C-alpha cells in the first residue's frame, strides 16, 4: 500500500457547493433559500421546537416525573496517594487543609478514594470515604472522620 493508492481518490470526493456565485451555477440568485421570509435572511430560522406560533409539543404534553437536580451532591474526589503527597509528615488532615492546598474546590464536598498506601497513623476529615480508603487509614492506626455533605444549591 502506498499513499497514491489510498481511498478516496481526489476525483471521488464531492466538492462543496459554492452558493450565490452566478445564475449559471444553478445556485446563484437566492442561493437555494427560496424567496424572502425568515429563513431567507442572514441568521434566519426558527428556534428548535418552534411550531409557527402553535402551542409546541413540549408544552402541550404534561409534566412527568420528579426532578432531583437541586438535591444532587457532587463530590470532589481525592486519592490517598495525592493526599499523602500533599501533606507529607502531617498526622492530622482537616477539610480546611484540603481546601487551602487546592486539592478540592472551596466549599465542595470531598470524597477520599483508596489509590495509594498509608504507612503511618493519620486522622483524616472529609465528607465521604470509599470503604477501602477507610480500611487502609484505620489499618495503619489512623482515624476517619465523616462530615455531613450539603447539596451545592
Curated annotation (Swiss-Prot):
A single Gene Ontology CC term: cytosolic large ribosomal subunit
GO annotation terms (biological process): translation
Protein family per UniProt: Belongs to the universal ribosomal protein uL15 family.
NCBIfam families per record: rplO_bact
UniProt protein name: Large ribosomal subunit protein uL15
InterPro entries with a match to the protein in the record: Ribosomal_uL15, Ribosomal_uL15/eL18, Ribosomal_uL15/eL18_sf, Ribosomal_uL15_bac-type, Ribosomal_uL15_CS
Function text: Binds to the 23S rRNA.
Sorted UniProt keywords: Ribonucleoprotein, Ribosomal protein, RNA-binding, rRNA-binding
Organism name: Desulfovibrio desulfuricans (strain ATCC 27774 / DSM 6949 / MB)
Molecular function, one GO term: rRNA binding
Region (Disordered): 1-49
Feature: compositional bias, Gly residues: 21-31
Subunit description: Part of the 50S ribosomal subunit.
Disulphide-bonded residues: none
Lineage, top ranks: Bacteria, Pseudomonadati, Thermodesulfobacteriota, Desulfovibrionia, Desulfovibrionales
Amino acid at each position: 500500500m502506498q499513499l497514491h493508492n489510498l481511498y478516496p481518490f481526489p476525483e471521488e470526493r464531492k466538492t462543496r457547493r459554492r452558493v450565490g456565485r452566478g445564475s449559471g451555477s444553478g445556485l446563484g440568485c437566492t442561493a437555494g433559500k427560496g424567496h424572502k421570509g425568515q429563513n431567507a435572511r442572514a441568521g434566519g430560522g426558527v428556534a428548535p421546537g418552534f411550531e409557527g406560533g402553535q402551542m409546541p409539543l413540549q408544552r402541550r404534553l404534561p409534566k412527568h416525573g420528579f426532578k432531583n437536580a437541586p438535591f444532587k451532591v457532587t463530590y470532589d474526589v481525592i486519592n490517598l496517594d495525592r493526599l499523602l503527597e500533599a501533606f507529607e509528615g502531617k498526622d492530622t488532615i482537616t477539610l480546611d487543609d484540603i481546601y487551602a492546598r487546592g486539592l478540592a474546590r472551596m466549599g465542595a464536598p470531598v470524597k477520599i478514594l483508596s489509590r495509594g498506601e498509608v504507612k503511618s497513623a493519620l486522622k483524616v476529615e472529609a465528607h465521604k470515604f470509599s470503604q477501602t480508603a477507610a480500611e487502609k487509614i484505620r489499618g495503619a492506626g489512623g482515624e476517619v472522620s465523616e462530615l455531613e455533605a450539603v447539596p451545592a444549591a
